[in-house]
Structure formats: C-alpha cells, structure tokens
C-alpha cells in the first residue's frame, strides 16, 4: 500500500485471504494497477487489482505491481475473490461478497480468482 493510504480515503478492513508467492498448477497472477490523472501532473488517482499484466491499458504501480497468485479454479480452502466497480466514481474494489457488499452503485465485474483462507 502507498504510504499515504489514509489520505486517499482507504481504510483497513482486515484480510480477505491470502495469495501464493509461488506458482502452482492452475495459478492465476494478480497485479496491482493504477489510473493516473493527466490533468493533475499524472498523479495516481485510483488503484485496482487485475489479472492482466498490462493493467487493462492502465499502469503498473511503481513499488512492485505483482501481488501474487490466486487459484483459477476453486479448490478446498479457497473462496472466490470478486472485483466490483462503481461507474460514477471509477472505483474498483475486491471483495468476497458476490453482491459487492450490498453497495447499490457497485456492479460485479468478475471473479479475479480464488484466494486461500
């Protein structure tokens, strides 16, 4: 996490689970990516998780963007990690909740993979 995470409005809500730092069969990589605002000296304005090493056309974070490996299939001891999106604010968030934590403006995008508990 960036050092200024509190100023970004982030809050620690606890752990969702764990990723593996070691490749395994059916592993799917997860990256942390950033959206920059070109009108504000390319300041980072949003972070999001992605399975795409190209960050879906955005940018890898500067301090090491490879987060770890998720399972691409559900195996014992794993749960789905969902990615949700709020169009109005361009916010992505990860959750174990298939209804995006009941956030009315959020839409479920996809399952990033399966995280270890």
Where are these regions (language model features)?
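Extracellular glycan-binding segments that recognize GlcNAc-based cell-wall polysaccharides
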Residues: 1-117
């Amino acid at each position: 996490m960036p050092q200024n995470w509190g100023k970004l409005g982030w809050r620690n809500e606890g752990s969702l689970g764990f990723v593996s730092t070691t490749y395994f069969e059916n592993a799917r990589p997860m990256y942390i990516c950033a959206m920059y605002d070109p009108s504000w000296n390319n300041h980072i304005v949003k972070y999001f998780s992605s399975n795409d090493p190209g960050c879906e056309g955005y940018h890898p974070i500067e301090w090491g963007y490879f987060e770890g490996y998720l399972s691409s299939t559900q195996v014992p001891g794993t749960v789905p990690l969902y990615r949700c999106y709020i169009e109005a604010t361009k916010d992505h968030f990860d959750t174990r909740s298939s209804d995006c934590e009941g956030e009315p403006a959020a839409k479920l995008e996809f399952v990033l993979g399966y995280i270890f508990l």
